[in-house]
């Protein structure tokens, strides 16, 4: 579905929405279920269309994560993560304990969030990374869909900073701190 974004109200106050209001609009058919957007501090933010390279990396990474994750973990693919009553994000992947239902996942439950970025690199490494940290997501990977280099964010801080951000080359092995069973070399994905 194509979404028309506007900046007509730039500089003017805008109405803020809650997660509950957005869910009600989706349930009522006002917003289509397949519409790609996130809610950030009450503001609806349309997401960029995904290009070929993004989809290639995402498909290969999906196979690896599903194959390697332990049975006590759930792998969400473009699942909404409700961080507070005015914010939800939709990472490409999210790993969290299986005992938690998808709609109940909160920031501190997320062991690993992964964003595959092509045109959204600045947004994913900037604003979204700060939001994930502020809400206690334990680890964030932002993968460059072109080069497959990955920025690994660990030790989230309540002020939205990360204690560590390391750029890892595509040839190096990535292993999330909270999951012993998962390791990936982005260069091996095809």
Report each predicted region and the residues it spans:
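Gly/Pro/Ser/Thr-rich low-complexity, intrinsically disordered segments predominantly at protein N-termini
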Residues: 1-190
